[in-house]
Amino acid sequence: MECSPILVERIRAAIETGGGAVSLARYMELALYEPDLGYYERTPRIVGRRGDFATSVSVGSLFGELMAYWIEHEVGASEGLSDGPVEIVEAGAHDGRWAEDILEALMRGSGKDGERFCYRIVEPSATRQAWQRERLARFGDRVVWSEAMPARVRGVILSNELLDAFPVERWCWNATQRRWVEQGVYWKEEKFDWIALPTPAPLEWNLPEELQSVLPNGFVRERSPSAVAWWARAAAALHAGCLITLDYGLEAEEFLTPGRSAGTLRAYHRHRFFDDLLSFPGEVDLTAHVDFSAVAEVGLQAGLVPWYRERQSRFLMRILESTQRSPGRFPDWSTQRVRAFQTLTHPEHFGRGFWVLAQGRGGAPWGRA
């Protein structure tokens, strides 16, 4: 596996400009999102069986159909949205497949009522926006694009595996000094390597005395200020409805367990992960677990109320149970669709490690809080 020499030179230039090192977050920003060269910018064909990783969307259309039913029957009936148009705002849409599945399900299941739902994709990348426009062309003006989150949203802001794709900082515990030290990236002996940065540790990471004495030297923890900031902006934009993400992640205290001493950041290629995180910029996916505690906190600070905070399996089963009360409004269950649902909910697939975090302006009409 060879990486782009142009991308390597751009990262090296950033390191030189930064005084000899950059944060891991800056390295990831270039390796993943540099126009035409970054991992997420090169091709839409990185997801699925023939790509580097699978997602709930790549399992098939069922995931989008279930979300469409939930949007119509829960979000569309929530406080402030029971009448009038409902906007669906998706961020991190990649090639637009989830949007396609959701829109097709809404048009098929809602009939004329489906016209109250309009779809917006927030996409800052011109490359990815072109992929999405090609896939969604047949929906015409029912789909619109913007580079940034709109100032006011009445409906649902949703994402699937978006927050885990934000760049992260990497911090190591210095047991002798009893403090966190940020690790950055520099160029050494013709390769990228780790180096300590003189960055003050986050104040919220002050550890209790009993944990300071047992946390092993070199214990790694990541944080993603950009993911938390994105959630805060989305929460501020939500005027009525729900802000929801489906992703893999942990609560704050779970990051400090013995099994995660090397952190959660992984490099993926062809459904395998690599321990060497810095060797193949632009050729591998770099992803870390979401800190749901930090994300949820900024939503609450913005005035949102809890809707869901549960495993993806339970959330989808709840939607499935609701579809049984609406005969004829959901497609019949073929063998293929049953297998897809099992993949989405089984503990060995997407059921255990993936979680749903949803917060809203107003209570959840299905009685969840």
Regions from the language model: what does each represent?
Residues 93, 162, 246-250:
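Short, well-ordered beta-to-alpha junction loops that form the rim of enzyme active sites
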Residues 6, 23-26, 58, 62, ...:
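Generic recognition of stable, solvent-exposed alpha-helical segments in well-folded globular domains
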Residues 31, 157, 295:
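A residue-level signal for conserved active-site and pocket-lining positions in enzyme catalytic cores
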Residues 146-150, 163-179, 223-233:
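A short, conserved alpha-helix within the catalytic core of class I
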Residues 154-155, 241:
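Conserved acidic residues
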Residues 204-369:
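Long, Lys/Arg- and hydrophobic-enriched amphipathic alpha-helices
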